[in-house]
């Protein structure tokens, strides 16, 4: 009979150490669970042969008392926009349906070197352009908290890293990689009731992450607990010669005390007034207020702060996003890279038809909009101005962090909406709502973490977001760990 797997990485590692569980049997259970939960559509593909081969090696290391790390033998998942050697990497798009990389993304490679076991590649919005994981060529992903097999209307998982969030929430994986351009890790983490973390830009290598918006893309981490998130972060952070945007200084792993020993006395918590916005649900507002009160009762001081350019941020983000998308998508021409049409009348027609077949409407619209903003007559009016306002948004954060140590905000404006409701609005309008609270952190390059707090009246997760100054990850994790211990979120783990 299968032994129920533990909830946390530390517990799993201890089971391996005492040999009450071994990596092979744990992996077999995980693969069985993934098979039972196929209706969630969290995975584009699983890799059972690779996973079991990795588990055999991990089992040998544990038996000899030489595990590589806390992650040795832990099942993980990787979003399908990170390159994995010998395994299809599709970005959930027809354009890359048959793409098999010859190398690994740095962040996955570092996890593998720490002994983590790859269960499979997770579903996403095409190229990461979405906030629901609803437009993949492999079909939408269903939120684990409210999914009934065969039911056509379900709660969305959030996006674009929805598959990774569901893989973690359902217990298939202990951790998963996502990407975060405007909230694509934190948004699904919020809806699925898991921890979602976006680090300071440059602390995690983007090598092998198929680019969407180079100036904002960062790898993200999804786990069930703050400690697990920190363990993964410690394993993959640090400079990478293959990515010139990584910080060149040595990364010192972060350690935290037990939650009971964390003291918040003297901590200054900022509450941005602009985040009390249109569409914010009463339940999220109440949760936000209660956690602020909880922090104050623990000795922290809570202060209203202003981030004046918040209202402009979503529009500036949209312009810059589309401009960089137009540039990045130019490489997919059907000649050297990506889907190739059967058209052979001319090179121009081959190029046009390959792109028409390989991209969905969302991608095409962003390419067209981006190229419009980049036209010579529009460049100064849109792109240059957007860059200037982005600097003002970053300055907002700089000023706020001169007054406070950390910011507390909603992650999403409500609990997870139904699929039928979500698709009533087009992708652009949905992103304007779904990314409102999350994309400013990408614009400023600062670290941010989404933490599940409680369940709504619909028995769905409600989460809040913490943001900290650049390179203040330790402070972020410390406060998150303290809150986690106080709220004791009710998990729905298998």
UniProtKB/Swiss-Prot annotation:
GO terms for biological process: glutaminyl-tRNAGln biosynthesis via transamidation; mitochondrial translation. It is an enzyme of class 6 (ligase). One of its GO terms (molecular function) is ATP binding. The active site is at residues 79, 160, 184. It catalyses: L-glutamyl-tRNA(Gln) + L-glutamine + ATP + H2O = L-glutaminyl-tRNA(Gln) + L-glutamate + ADP + phosphate + H(+). It is found in: Mitochondrion. GO terms for cellular component: glutamyl-tRNA(Gln) amidotransferase complex; mitochondrion. SUPFAM superfamilies: Amidase signature (AS) enzymes (SSF75304). Its main location: mitochondrion. It comes from the Eukaryota. Signal peptide: none annotated. Its EC number is 6.3.5.7. InterPro entries: Amidase, Amidase_dom, AS_sf, GatA. Keywords: ATP-binding, Ligase, Mitochondrion, Nucleotide-binding, Protein biosynthesis. Belongs to the amidase family. GatA subfamily. Allows the formation of correctly charged Gln-tRNA(Gln) through the transamidation of misacylated Glu-tRNA(Gln) in the mitochondria. The reaction takes place in the presence of glutamine and ATP through an activated gamma-phospho-Glu-tRNA(Gln). Subunit of the heterotrimeric GatCAB amidotransferase (AdT) complex, composed of A, B and C subunits. This is Glutamyl-tRNA(Gln) amidotransferase subunit A, mitochondrial. It comes from Aedes aegypti. The gene is gatA.
């Amino acid at each position: 009979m299968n032994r129920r797997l533990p909830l946390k990485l530390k517990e799993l590692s201890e089971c391996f150490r005492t040999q009450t569980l071994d990596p092979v049997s744990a992996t077999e259970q995980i693969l069985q669970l993934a098979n039972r939960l196929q209706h969630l559509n969290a995975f584009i593909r699983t890799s059972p042969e690779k996973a079991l081969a990795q588990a055999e090696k991990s089992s040998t290391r544990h038996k000899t008392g030489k595990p590589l790390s806390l992650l040795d033998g832990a099942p993980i998942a990787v979003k399908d926009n990170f390159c994995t050697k010998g395994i299809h990497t599709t970005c959930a798009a027809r354009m890359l349906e048959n793409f098999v990389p010859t190398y690994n993304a740095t962040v996955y490679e570092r996890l593998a070197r720490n002994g983590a076991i790859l269960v499979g590649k997770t579903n996403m919005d095409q190229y990461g352009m979405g906030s629901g994981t609803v437009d993949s060529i492999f079909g939408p992903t269903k939120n684990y908290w409210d999914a009934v097999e065969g039911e056509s209307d379900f709660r969305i998982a959030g996006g674009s890293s929805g598959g990774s969030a569901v893989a973690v929430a359902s217990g298939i994986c202990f951790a998963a990689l996502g990407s975060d351009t405007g909230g694509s890790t934190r948004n699904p983490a919020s809806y699925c009731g898991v921890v979602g973390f976006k680090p300071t830009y440059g602390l995690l290598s983007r090598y092998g992450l198929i680019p969407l918006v180079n100036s904002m893309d960062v790898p993200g981490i999804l786990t069930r607990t703050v400690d697990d998130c920190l363990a993964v972060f410690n394993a993959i952070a640090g400079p990478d010669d293959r990515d010139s945007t990584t910080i060149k200084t040595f990364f010192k792993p972060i350690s935290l005390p037990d939650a009971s020993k964390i003291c918040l006395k003297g901590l200054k918590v900022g509450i941005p007034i602009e985040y009390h916005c249109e569409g914010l649900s009463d339940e999220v507002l109440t949760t936000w207020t209660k956690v602020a009160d909880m922090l104050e009762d623990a000795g922290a001081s809570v202060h209203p702060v202003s981030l004046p350019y918040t209202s402009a941020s979503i529009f500036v983000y949209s312009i810059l996003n589309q401009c960089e998308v137009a540039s990045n998508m130019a490489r997919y021409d059907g000649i050297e890279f990506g889907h190739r049409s059967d058209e052979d009348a001319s090179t121009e027609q081959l190029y046009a038809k390959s792109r028409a077949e390989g991209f969905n409407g969302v991608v095409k619209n962003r390419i067209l909009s981006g190229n419009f903003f980049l036209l010579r007559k529009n460049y100064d009016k849109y792109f240059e101005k957007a860059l200037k306002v982005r600097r003002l948004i970053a300055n907002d954060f700089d000023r706020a962090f001169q007054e406070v140590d950390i910011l507390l905000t909603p992650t999403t404006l409500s609990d997870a909406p139904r699929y039928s409701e979500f698709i009533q609005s087009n992708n652009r309008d949905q992103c304007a709502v779904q990314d409102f609270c999350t994309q400013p952190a990408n614009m400023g390059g600062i670290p941010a973490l989404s933490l599940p707090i409680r369940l709504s009246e619909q028995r769905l997760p409600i989460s809040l977001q913490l943001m900290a100054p650049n390179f203040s990850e330790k402070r972020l994790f410390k406060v998150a760990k303290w809150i986690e211990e106080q709220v004791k979120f009710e998990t729905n783990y298998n």
